[in-house]
UniProtKB/Swiss-Prot annotation:
GO biological process: biotin biosynthetic process
Taxonomic source organism: Rhodopirellula baltica (strain DSM 10527 / NCIMB 13988 / SH1)
Name of the protein in question: Biotin synthase
Domain Radical SAM core: 76-302
Catalyzed reaction equations: (4R,5S)-dethiobiotin + (sulfur carrier)-SH + 2 reduced [2Fe-2S]-[ferredoxin] + 2 S-adenosyl-L-methionine = (sulfur carrier)-H + biotin + 2 5'-deoxyadenosine + 2 L-methionine + 2 oxidized [2Fe-2S]-[ferredoxin]
Residues annotated to bind [2Fe-2S] cluster: C138, C170, C230, R300
Length: 359
């Protein structure tokens, strides 16, 4: 997929990042990132050159990048944070060869393996999601795509969850055809997650059992069925900075409403085991770039934030406006109370919070 660059007219010239071999480097010109944020707020989209320059900026620029990105985030989302809750409704047993995934057929990671959970387990998890202040309950299965039994299970449980707990439902079921997307819409699913995961040019290096275009087609089916699209990616899989920029622009062109940015947790037993970790500064620059490219889209710091951002997690919420509360699919997240404390200390507010939440 090619995404045409926006016109460079009225745009801010990208700074010269001559010394990109050093994480120290030099400062960009004073006020550069504020001017770039103003450009975006005035309606002139960021260009690929500007986005790439942000990723190549020295670590000295990180505070300025985050501060400027916060202006954009605040314009569209104020100081609100939306919480998501993940439920691994079916674990392992996946026939796909996604190299980053501990549940894929090429993974030797010791993950739980079970078919789609029964009603009571899914309802119990929905109750936890509501108690933790989540607005959206994410039902996830490991599969190339849902079989008929799994589709029926989702169709049966979604109306009950929505009626009892007033949660939005995001379904992550793998590749979908047109009729499956229509059925999900009919049963009350609000949003479908299907990540692009990387750029089109890098995709065959992380998966060979389906294509980048397969994923894009699923998103088109979701859009055409009238549901919101949730799609993002994983950074730190050996891709180039240009690949990350391409993914951000592709998501923008598709009109994706919610963008989760994962930072690779190179799980032992997967083909990407031992992949060098991104620095917190590089992760922050990438998050900010996604915000500049997609100014009015929900941006979520997803898997890997605790591992890679570490003590800089709060800085991420100055550009992102959403996080998962609790654990991920096969890895642990930090304690929910730590997330509540972080949000409170930032002076931010949770969207859709409830009385049971300690914040």
């Amino acid at each position: 997929m090619s995404v045409a660059d926006s016109s460079a007219a009225d745009s801010v010239a990208a700074p010269d990042t001559a010394d990109t071999s050093s994480s120290v480097g030099v400062f960009s010109p004073p006020g550069y990132y504020d001017a770039l944020a103003q450009q975006v707020l005035d309606g002139t989209p960021i260009t690929r050159e500007q986005a790439l320059a942000m990723l190549e900026a020295s670590d000295l620029d990180v505070p300025a990048i985050i501060s400027a990105g916060y202006r954009i985030r605040h314009q569209y989302f104020g100081n609100t944070v939306q919480l998501y809750f993940l439920m691994n409704a079916k674990s392992g047993l996946c026939p796909e060869d996604c190299h980053y995934c501990s549940q894929s057929k090429v993974s030797d990671a010791p993950v739980p393996k079970y078919n789609i959970l029964k009603r009571d387990a899914l309802m119990d998890a929905a109750k936890v999601a509501a108690e933790r202040g989540a607005k959206t309950y994410c039902l996830v299965i490991s599969a190339r795509g849902p079989n008929e039994r799994e589709m029926k299970a989702v169709e049966e449980i979604v109306p009950e969850i929505k009626q009892k707990y007033n949660l939005d439902i995001c379904a992550c079921l793998g590749l979908l055809d047109e009729s499956q997307a229509a059925r999900l819409k009919a049963c009350g699913v609000d949003r479908v997650n299907h990540n692009l995961n990387s750029s089109e040019s890098h995709y065959e290096k992380i998966c060979t059992t389906h294509t980048y275009e397969d994923r894009v087609q699923t998103l088109r089916h979701v859009r055409d069925a009238g549901m919101e699209m949730c799609s993002g990616g994983i950074i730190g899989m050996g891709e180039s900075k240009s690949d990350i920029v391409s993914m951000a622009f592709d998501l923008n062109e598709l009109g994706v409403q919610s963008i989760p940015v994962n930072i690779l947790n190179a799980i032992d037993g997967t083909p990407l085991e031992g992949t060098a970790a991104l620095t917190p500064q590089d992760a922050l620059k990438a998050l900010a770039m996604f915000r500049f490219v997609n100014p009015d889209r929900e941006l979520r710091i997803a898997g890997g934030r605790e591992l890679h951002l570490r003590q800089l997690q709060p800085m991420g919420l100055y550009v992102a406006n959403s996080v998962f509360v609790g654990d991920y699919l096969t890895t642990q997240g930090q304690a929910p109370q730590a997330d509540y404390d972080m949000i409170r200390d930032l002076g931010f507010d949770v969207t859709g919070s409830c009385e049971e939440m300690s914040i």
